[in-house]
Amino acid sequence: KRGFLDVIKHVGKAALSVVSHLINEGEH
């Protein structure tokens, strides 16, 4: 199950990066 949690963390970080990118694109 630890591997599963690692996947969740990885996906979460990726999602955060995408959201931040979209927000930055929207502001400019």
Swiss-Prot record:
Tissue expression, per UniProt? Expressed by the skin glands.
Alphabetically list the UniProt keywords.
Amidation, Amphibian defense peptide, Antimicrobial, Cleavage on pair of basic residues, Secreted
Domain of life where this protein originates: Eukaryota
Q: Which residues form the propeptide?
A: 27-28
PTM annotation (Glutamic acid 1-amide): residues: E25
Tell me which Gene Ontology terms the entry assigns under biological process: defense response
Q: Which GO terms describe its cellular component?
A: extracellular region
Which compartments does it reside in? Secreted
Q: What job does this protein perform?
A: Has antimicrobial activity.
- Give the record's family classification: Belongs to the frog skin active peptide (FSAP) family. Cruzioseptin subfamily.
Q: What is this protein called?
A: Cruzioseptin-4
Q: Which organism was this protein described from?
A: Cruziohyla calcarifer (Splendid leaf frog)
